[in-house]
From Swiss-Prot:
This is Choline-phosphate cytidylyltransferase. InterPro entries: CTP-phospocholine_CTT, GlmU-like, MobA-like_NTP_Trfase, Nucleotide-diphossugar_trans. Keywords: Lipopolysaccharide biosynthesis, Magnesium, Metal-binding, Nucleotidyltransferase, Transferase. Cytidylyltransferase involved in the biosynthesis of lipopolysaccharides (LPS), a necessary component and antigenic determinant of the outer membrane that has been shown to be an important factor in the host-parasite interaction in a number of Gram-negative species. Catalyzes the activation of phosphocholine (P-Cho) to CDP-choline (CDP-Cho). LicC is critical for the expression of the 6A2-specific epitope. SUPFAM superfamilies: Nucleotide-diphospho-sugar transferases. One of its GO terms (biological process) is lipopolysaccharide biosynthetic process. It comes from Haemophilus influenzae (strain ATCC 51907 / DSM 11121 / KW20 / Rd). Mg(2+) binds at D102, E213, D215.
Length: 233
């Protein structure tokens, strides 16, 4: 099994704090957040871990030796969206997790290997333009809506079987034109979303205290309060 971690972003909504520290490396009670995720992946015996870096890429160098992971530098992180980051790591996209680097985990969700592709979902306390998977009676995702309803939304972590990886990789070339890569409204997740009927993907809903979104300083401070050391699992 593999894991691709997308960590090229600027984190501009954090203002001054991310001028000197990448948002995925912000400290969570003594440990950079990304190291928490890497520790969980190693505990789950994930074979190959690749981190796609960009902004402040030099800050990730120490992770190569510490966690035996691969770093890929996206030099176009300022001009291209995450589809380009994903394309740089496509050789690893096989029986694979894809993880947003700024996701904060409070539990190791990687210990049981999924039997099929899945989106990990969560009901967020605050909702705004969330990606909401719509399921059929068998629990299979048949489409993804974008909205602010109080229902399970994509958490920033997904798993893809080899079969679905191959389908997505075949579609990837449709998204690598300059126009699409420079469109800030497109993400790597846009590819499976627009071709969901070709994929065999389900969901696993996490508890609200299993996973947190870290989009801005308010989120960060909220997470620090929620994850006091004696509350962590």
């Amino acid at each position: 099994m593999n894991a691709i971690i997308l960590a090229a972003g600027l984190g501009s909504r954090f203002k001054d704090i991310t001028q000197s520290t990448h948002k995925s490396l912000l400290d969570i009670h003594g440990t950079p957040n990304l190291e928490r995720t890497l520790t969980f992946l190693r505990q789950a015996n994930i074979d190959n871990i690749v981190i796609v870096t960009g902004y402040l890429h030099e800050q990730f160098e120490y992770l190569k030796k510490k966690y035996d992971c691969t770093l890929i530098y996206n030099e176009k992180y300022r001009e291209y969206n995450s589809i380009y980051s994903f394309s740089l790591a496509q050789d690893f996209f096989n029986d694979c997790y894809v993880i947003d680097a700024d996701v904060v985990l409070n539990r190791n969700i990687f210990l049981t290997k999924p039997s099929h592709s899945k989106y990990f979902t969560v009901i967020r306390s605050k909702t705004h333009n969330e990606w909401l998977p719509i399921l059929n009676s068998n629990g299979q995702v048949i489409r993804i809506d974008i909205g602010s309803l109080n229902q399970p939304s994509l958490s920033g972590i997904s798993f893809w079987t080899t079969q679905d990886c191959n389908i997505i990789l075949t579609l990837l070339k449709e998204y690598t034109s300059e126009v699409r890569l420079k469109n800030p409204k497109l993400y790597w997740d846009t590819i499976p979303m627009e071709y969901i009927e070709k994929l065999n993907i389900y969901t696993e809903q996490l508890n609200s205290d299993d996973i947190f979104e870290m989009d801005n300083l308010d989120d960060y401070h909220h997470i620090l309060q929620k994850l006091t050391p004696n509350k962590e699992k």
